[in-house]
Amino acid sequence: MPAALVENSQVICEVWASNLEEEMRKIREIVLSYSYIAMDTEFPGVVVRPIGEFRSSIDYQYQLLRCNVDLLKIIQLGLTFTNEKGEYPSGINTWQFNFKFNLTEDMYSQDSIDLLANSGLQFQKHEEEGIDTLHFAELLMTSGVVLCDNVKWLSFHSGYDFGYMVKLLTDSRLPEEEHEFFHILNLFFPSIYDVKYLMKSCKNLKGGLQEVADQLDLQRIGRQHQAGSDSLLTGMAFFRMKELFFEDSIDDAKYCGRLYGLGTGVAQKQNEDVDSAQEKMSILAIINNMQQ
């Protein structure tokens, strides 16, 4: 069915605390055949700036991300599932997870909250019926979505998105050093393609997600600045770009694991000879130390 003819309620499932476990059961089945996952988050903006001396502007960008992710809470997560051809499962293909968030108690940027409210987010419902992040993390760990080498993650300018995901999965602050962040990221998300990073090799493509979608003649389903709709559009953009600019083959050595705007951004194993079990054990030790 053409995207323009699809109602968002037919393909995007709203997930709250009441239906979380039921929908995660469906995802455990879906990911077996649809292992390309486009992801987007909504979060309450940027509220602080790091102070002190920084090794470089790139180091500053990571410290900016780190201090804000540590202070703030994720509001929404969108996950869209496709196969390697960009084909969707029949029916629902996108899940929009709505997390607990309290405008009275939690920190936020007013401009960001106004934007999200104008985009249709229901903050009263987030407070009363939102998902507990710890419960979600427990279910995600055993979902077949993270910690799996065969799952490919698609994102757009996603440093903050993955920052919030690492915080959620580790239940701890982000590591002080960017290279430690990428080690942990690689454990949970072994294969990441950031569409904004891919755009560096796509002549004339520029701007944010909606601008890119317009240039690629893609039809949005749902509302902009909602995580489900944005994740769905991110997946569409990836597969259209892969076809138009990369001859349906993306060079992993050049693009996989690179996040736009963060350092070298390589979330890949440094040495293919390193035993992966030992690598994962060392990363888990880092996480354990962070939680203590």
From Swiss-Prot:
Stored InterPro entries: CNOT7/CNOT8/Pop2, RNase_CAF1, RNaseH-like_sf, RNaseH_sf
Which UniProt keyword terms apply here?
Cytoplasm, Exonuclease, Hydrolase, Metal-binding, Nuclease, Nucleus, Repressor, RNA-binding, RNA-mediated gene silencing, Transcription, Transcription regulation, Translation regulation
* Disulfide linkage: none
Q: Which GO terms describe its cellular component?
A: CCR4-NOT complex; CCR4-NOT core complex; cytosol; nucleus; P-body
Gene Ontology molecular functions: 3'-5'-RNA exonuclease activity; metal ion binding; poly(A)-specific ribonuclease activity; RNA binding
Location comes to: Cytoplasm; Nucleus
Domain of life per record: Eukaryota
Is Zinc among this UniProt entry's keywords? no
> Which residues are noted in the entry as a divalent metal cation 1-binding?
D40, D161
Q: Which residues bind a divalent metal cation 2?
A: D40, E42, D230
Reaction catalysed by this chain? Answer: Exonucleolytic cleavage of poly(A) to 5'-AMP
What's the EC number here?
3.1.13.4
Q: Which GO biological process entries does UniProt record here?
A: miRNA-mediated gene silencing by mRNA destabilization; nuclear-transcribed mRNA catabolic process, deadenylation-dependent decay; nuclear-transcribed mRNA poly(A) tail shortening; positive regulation of cell population proliferation; positive regulation of mRNA catabolic process; regulation of translation
Q: Known Pfam families for this protein? A: CAF1 (PF04857)
Stated role: Has 3'-5' poly(A) exoribonuclease activity for synthetic poly(A) RNA substrate. Its function seems to be partially redundant with that of CNOT7. Catalytic component of the CCR4-NOT complex which is linked to various cellular processes including bulk mRNA degradation, miRNA-mediated repression, translational repression during translational initiation and general transcription regulation. During miRNA-mediated repression the complex also seems to act as translational repressor during translational initiation. Additional complex functions may be a consequence of its influence on mRNA expression.
Family, similarity comment: Belongs to the CAF1 family.
How it assembles, according to the record, is: Component of the CCR4-NOT complex; distinct complexes seem to exist that differ in the participation of probably mutually exclusive catalytic subunits; the complex contains two deadenylase subunits, CNOT6 or CNOT6L, and CNOT7 or CNOT8. In the complex interacts directly with CNOT1. Interacts with BTG1, BTG2 and TOB1. Interacts with BTG4.
- Protein name stated in the entry: CCR4-NOT transcription complex subunit 8
Q: Which organism is it from?
A: Homo sapiens
Task: Name the gene behind this protein.
Answer: CNOT8
